[in-house]
């Protein structure tokens, strides 16, 4: 699944005590001055993004981020029209501290009181020791609600940008909880494939960042795993007979497009240089998949097939569901 999110499983033993040298303070446990200061820094980065001030953001980033700023810059430029004139509100704040002298292979932080609405966990690979903050902002834009998660690191007494994650919180006008409820309804109706795909949509939308989790989210990951159809490429590629031809399917996942929620199918192809042949294969895959699983007609507005070479180069075709026959 594109952008696959990490499921963090919390065991009772780990919850009983914090990881050695790794502590977290949730917003409700912070003193007011610290919480306000972190929120103000996050708001400043949002304001710079709304102005398109990528130079200023880069200057106020840690060295690792400033030397690899291309992805953040592209996101800021793309979203500037949405953020210009918008207002941001702080939803949640977390202060993370990691002791030591070497990067931590898998730093684990447990924040807040377990069972409370503010409890959260973070699992961050290869984290250098230091003091960090995670601030999540809610933003109302002309294109709907967005969330901006800023990762801050204390550097020389100042909080600098160490991560920037900005994205919509809805697909086709619906949030993650809506997709979760739809997934459960599809499961109850015996539409296992639509159910699983809607679980994936919910899990794309619910966590602000892929290294954050909480107990209810862990339960949803469990639900999704149990709902995974055996004939889908969940644990590796699967071979399907589609439109009279055998195809090796690598990935199947939902995605929002301008036309609404679409189903994306990635399959293996030795060569896509013959675009006419690739187009024909794409249409075979699209039509064959819908014929194999008719329930998809009600679940998706369209289907995308992407013939993918071993190099990763691909050739894609989008077909509206009304045109799949």
Which residues does each PLM region occupy?
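Surface-exposed, charged secondary-structure patches
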Residues: 70, 77-145, 173, 231-272
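Short beta-strand edge/turn micro-motifs at domain boundaries
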Residues: 22, 134-174, 253-273, 284-323
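Bacterial N-terminal signal peptides
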Residues: 7-17
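Alpha-helical segment of the N-proximal tetratricopeptide repeat
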Residues: 47, 174-194
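Positively charged n-region of N-terminal signal peptides that target proteins for export
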Residues: 1-5
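Short solvent-exposed beta->alpha transition segments
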Residues: 25-33, 39-40, 55-119, 205-232
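Short, low-complexity N-terminal intrinsically disordered segments enriched in polar/charged residues
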Residues: 20-51, 165-178
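TPR/TPR-like (Sel1-like) alpha-helical repeat modules
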Residues: 192-209
């Amino acid at each position: 699944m594109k952008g696959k999110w990490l499921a963090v499983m919390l065991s009772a033993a780990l919850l009983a005590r914090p990881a050695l040298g790794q502590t977290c303070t949730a917003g409700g446990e912070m003193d007011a001055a610290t919480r306000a200061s972190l929120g103000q820094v996050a708001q400043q980065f949002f304001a710079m993004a709304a102005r398109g001030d990528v130079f200023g953001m880069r200057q106020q980033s840690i060295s690792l981020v400033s030397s690899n700023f291309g992805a953040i810059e592209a996101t800021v430029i793309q979203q500037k029209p949405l953020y210009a004139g918008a207002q941001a509100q702080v939803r949640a704040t977390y202060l993370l501290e990691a002791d030591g002298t070497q990067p931590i292979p898998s730093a684990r932080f447990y924040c807040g009181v377990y069972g409370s609405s503010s409890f959260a966990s973070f699992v961050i690979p290869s984290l250098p020791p230091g003091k960090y903050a995670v601030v999540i902002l809610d933003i109302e834009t002309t294109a709907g609600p967005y969330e901006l998660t800023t990762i801050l690191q204390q550097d020389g007494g100042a909080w600098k940008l160490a991560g920037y994650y900005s994205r919509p919180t809805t697909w086709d006008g619906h949030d993650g909880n809506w997709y979760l409820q739809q997934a459960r309804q599809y499961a109850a109706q015996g539409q296992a494939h639509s159910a699983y795909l809607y679980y994936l949509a919910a899990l794309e939308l619910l966590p602000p960042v892929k290294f954050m989790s909480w107990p209810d989210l862990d339960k949803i990951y469990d639900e999704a795993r149990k709902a995974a159809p055996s004939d889908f490429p969940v644990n590796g590629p699967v071979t399907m007979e589609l439109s009279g031809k055998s195809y090796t399917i690598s990935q199947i996942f939902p995605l929002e497009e301008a036309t609404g929620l679409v189903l994306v199918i990635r399959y293996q192809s030795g060569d896509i240089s013959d675009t006419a042949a690739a187009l024909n294969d794409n249409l075979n895959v699209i039509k064959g998949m819908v014929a194999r699983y008719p329930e998809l007609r009600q679940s998706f507005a369209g289907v995308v097939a992407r013939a993918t070479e071993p190099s990763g180069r691909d050739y894609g075709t989008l077909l509206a569901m009304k045109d799949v026959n």
